[in-house]
Structure formats: C-alpha cells, structure tokens
Design a protein with these regions (language model features):
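Short, charge-rich amphipathic alpha-helices with coiled-coil/heptad character
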Residues: 1-5, 19-59, 85, 132-148
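Short cysteine-rich clusters marking metal-coordination/redox-active sites
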Residues: 204, 230-233
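Short Cys/His-rich local motifs and their 1-3 flanking residues in nucleic-acid-associated proteins
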Residues: 209, 232-235
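Short linker/helix segments within small regulatory modules
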Residues: 218-227
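Amphipathic alpha-helical coiled-coil segments
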Residues: 53-65, 106-127, 173-174
Length: 246
C-alpha cells in the first residue's frame, strides 16, 4: 500500500490520541477516588450493621427491664396485701404463720429481683452509651461517604470531559485520513493494540523491538510513500520526516 508521507504522520497523532483514550479508560476503571468511595461505603455499612445489632440489644434489654419492673411491682403488691391482712387482725394463727412465711419469701424474692434489675439497668446504660457512640460514628462515616462520592464523581466527570475532547480530536484526525490507510490502522489497532509507531533509532515505536539490519535496509530502500509494517508487531511503521525515503 502507498500513502502520502503527511498521511502516514497523521497516524502517529492518531495513535497518540488512541493511547490517551486507552489510558483514560484504564484510569476510569481504576480510579483511586472510586476505591476510596468503596472503602468508605464498606465502613459505613459495617458501622450501620453494628448500630443495628446494638439497637436490637437495646430493645432486648429494655424489654427485660420492663419485665423485671413488672415482677417487682407484682411482688410489692402481694406484700402490701399480706401486710394489710396481718394488720387487720382477722386472720387465725395458722393463717398468720402462713402470711409471715410468705412475706419473708416475698421480701427475699423482691431483693433478688431488685439486684437483678440493677444489673440489667447497668447493662442497659452501657448498651445505650455504645449505641449512641456507634450512631455518631455511623453518621460521621455517612458524611465521609458523601465526601468520597463527590470526589469520585468529580474525577469521573474530569475523565469524561477528557475522553470527549480526545474523541473529538480523533474524529478530526480520521476525517483527514485516507479511508484505506485508516482501515489498515484500525484493523491493526483492534488486533494488535497499537496501530502505528514511529521508527526511531532502529526500533519500532509500537512494540519497542529493535529491527535487524536486513529489515532496516529494506526500509531504507522503500519509497517515501510506501506503507511499511513492523515485522514483529505488524504496526504501521512511520519513518521520521528527516530520514524518509532514499
């Protein structure tokens, strides 16, 4: 294939644009801001899970406090009833002994329940404190997520803008290229990754492999408008303007 030297050099500009588009795509897929956002989101979710577990624990201990308070209240009412009977003077000696024994049992039961209630209330206080601290931590992490989200979105927007600029530049360059030369370039780019490279110091600018003397001689003997290919990577070899042709 033959193509004007200027056309061939346009391929180098196009290859530069395509390389930048590849870099932008890679950057978009590996954004540090995305990783920071993912980490912040994971931490927030873990904190929210811990907050949920503490909320359940707090509900459970509240229910236990309510149950114990009800039991203590029931024992006290029973004690009040027994004392009222004792004070009434209407019970016989057998009933009196039974009431006194029951009162002793009830007083012991009340003391035990109050001790248990005190322990549970202390546990409730501890869990409530942990819950409040965890809620504050979760809220702080939520704010971190929003900051990370904004940074991620700004970085993504910057990449999108840069990609749009490169796409526009590519459209401009391809509009000035011969259709057959562009098709050859695009076909190589799809199959080999890099469509064209500058021949410099005996090396292919696409694959960076040094060419042997025989290949260099063949290239030197070729006409300026001859479209050359790298024997290693098959990229289009573009010769420097100052050394093009014989």
């Amino acid at each position: 294939m033959k193509s004007d030297v200027a056309q061939q050099h346009l391929l180098l500009k196009l290859a530069g644009v395509d390389a930048e588009l590849v870099r932008l795509t890679h950057r978009a897929a590996h954004l540090p801001e995305q990783q920071a956002y993912d980490q912040a989101l994971a931490e927030e979710r873990a904190a929210t899970d811990r907050l949920g577990a503490l909320a359940v624990a707090l509900d459970d201990v509240e229910a236990e406090v309510t149950r114990l308070e009800a039991e203590v209240d029931a024992v006290r009412r029973r004690e009040d009833r027994d004392r009222s009977l004792l004070d009434s003077g209407t019970v016989n000696p057998k009933q009196l002994a039974e009431l006194q024994h029951e009162l002793t049992t009830l007083e012991r039961r009340q003391a035990d329940l109050e001790d248990i209630l005190l322990e549970v209330m202390e546990r409730r206080e501890q869990i409530a404190g942990d819950h409040a601290a965890q809620r504050a931590a979760a809220e702080a992490l939520g704010r971190d997520v929003e900051v990370a989200r904004q940074a991620r979105d700004e970085a993504s927007a910057g990449i999108d803008q840069a990609r749009a600029e490169q796409d526009a530049r590519r459209t401009e360059l391809t509009a000035g290229l011969d259709a057959d030369l562009l098709a050859l370039y695009d076909g190589q780019r799809v199959s080999g990754g890099i469509g064209a490279g500058l021949l410099q110091a005996g090396r292919c600018g696409a694959c960076r492999i040094e060419l042997d003397r025989g290949e260099i001689g063949r290239i030197a003997a070729a006409s300026d408008d001859e479209v050359l290919r790298c024997p290693e990577c098959r990229a289009i070899l573009v010769r420097p303007l100052k050394t093009a042709g014989r």
